[in-house]
């Protein structure tokens, strides 16, 4: 089950990076009601 564990860690790390990047790049000039990526 090592492959499954590696896959899970990869997905979790990917989503954490997306969340952190989105949080840090959220400038005040952008409307928070819109998620325009």
UniProtKB/Swiss-Prot annotation:
The chain crosses the membrane at residues 4-24. It is a single-pass membrane protein. InterPro entries: PSII_PsbI, PSII_PsbI_sf. GO terms for biological process: photosynthesis. Pfam families: PsbI. Belongs to the PsbI family. PSII is composed of 1 copy each of membrane proteins PsbA, PsbB, PsbC, PsbD, PsbE, PsbF, PsbH, PsbI, PsbJ, PsbK, PsbL, PsbM, PsbT, PsbX, PsbY, PsbZ, Psb30/Ycf12, at least 3 peripheral proteins of the oxygen-evolving complex and a large number of cofactors. It forms dimeric complexes. This is Photosystem II reaction center protein I. It comes from Stigeoclonium helveticum (Green alga). The gene is psbI.
């Amino acid at each position: 089950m090592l492959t499954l564990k590696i896959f899970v860690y990869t997905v979790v790390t990917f989503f954490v990076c997306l969340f952190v990047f989105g949080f840090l790049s959220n400038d005040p000039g952008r409307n928070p009601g819109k998620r325009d990526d």
